[in-house]
């Protein structure tokens, strides 16, 4: 394919990951529009507005300049799907429900332009299974792009292809993630939880087994497996609580 020129990115889902991915795109001066469901009360973009405002209060800060939150475009699936036509990269980051993701893909498919890459930020669902909801024309441009929390600070991004992902498209996306977003990319197979989470969960389970063997308390384990092992902020049990 020709050079992947990302003029604008759409992020679908204004939750913890979606909002922070949008923030990091703003940090590196990439225009971005953040989508979510229409609010049931008040302005239709209320869910996204609340998420964008929340970015200013998070620690560690997802925005290099808090005022740059205003640069994140706000949209909802009811009124603004036409905006997807102007996006060269669409990152889906909604809740980890296969059925919800498949429904969303069917809704957005008519608005994905014929050169855009569509990528899911799922942390472990089957990328191939997700691709089954897409038209044949989009499947070569669909893949997994797994950021880690918090995305501004975590260097790793996993890229996952399906049997129908065009290699040139994955190469182009990797170039964007490394050169523009400043991330290190590891390509993973479409296996449960990919690489990092699969290894991480195995480590947690092994640690929990030792807790039983030695009668350790949660606080002691989190102290031993937290900053003493180089983890940024949390040990085994605290991490298990949030993932």
Regions found by a protein language model. Give the residues of each.
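NAD(P)+-binding Rossmann beta1-loop-alpha1 motif at the extreme N-terminus of oxidoreductases
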Residues: 1-57, 111
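Phosphate-coordination loops involved in phosphoryl transfer and adenosine-cofactor binding
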Residues: 5-8, 69, 87, 115
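Conserved N-terminal Rossmann-fold NAD(P) cofactor-binding segment
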Residues: 31-88, 98-99, 103, 134-136
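Generic secondary-structure signature for well-ordered alpha-helical cores
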Residues: 53, 57-60, 110-113, 175-183, ...
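N-terminal Rossmann-like NAD(P) cofactor-binding module of classical short-chain dehydrogenase/reductase
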Residues: 91
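Short glycine-/small-residue-rich Rossmann-like dinucleotide-binding loops
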Residues: 94-95, 123
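Rossmann-fold NAD(P)-binding glycine/threonine-rich loop
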Residues: 102-156, 161-174
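Substrate-binding/catalytic subdomain of NAD(P)-dependent oxidoreductase enzymes
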Residues: 160, 186-243
């Amino acid at each position: 394919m020709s050079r992947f020129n990302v003029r604008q990115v759409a992020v679908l889902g204004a939750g913890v990951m979606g909002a922070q991915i949008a923030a990091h795109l703003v940090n590196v001066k990439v225009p971005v529009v953040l989508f979510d469901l229409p609010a049931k009360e008040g302005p239709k973009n209320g869910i996204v507005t609340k998420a964008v405002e929340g970015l200013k209060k998070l620690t560690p800060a997802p925005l290099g300049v808090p005022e740059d939150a205003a640069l994140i475009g706000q949209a909802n699936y009811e009124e603004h799907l036409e905006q997807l036509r102007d996006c060269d990269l669409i990152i889906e980051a909604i809740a980890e429900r296969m059925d919800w993701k498949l429904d969303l893909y069917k809704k957005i498919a008519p608005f994905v332009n014929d050169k855009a890459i569509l990528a899911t930020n799922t942390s472990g669902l089957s990328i191939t299974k997700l691709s089954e909801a897409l038209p044949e024309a989009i499947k070569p441009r669909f893949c997994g792009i797994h950021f880690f929390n918090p995305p501004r600070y975590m260097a790793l991004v996993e890229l996952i292809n399906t049997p129908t992902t065009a290699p040139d498209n994955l190469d182009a996306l990797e170039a964007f993630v490394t050169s523009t977003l400043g991330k290190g990319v590891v390509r993973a197979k479409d296996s449960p939880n990919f690489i990092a989470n699969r290894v991480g969960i195995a480590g947690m389970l092994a640690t929990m087994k030792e807790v039983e063997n030695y009668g350790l308390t949660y606080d002691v384990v989190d102290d031993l497996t937290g900053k003493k092992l180089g983890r940024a902020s949390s040990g085994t049990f605290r991490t298990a609580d949030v993932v």
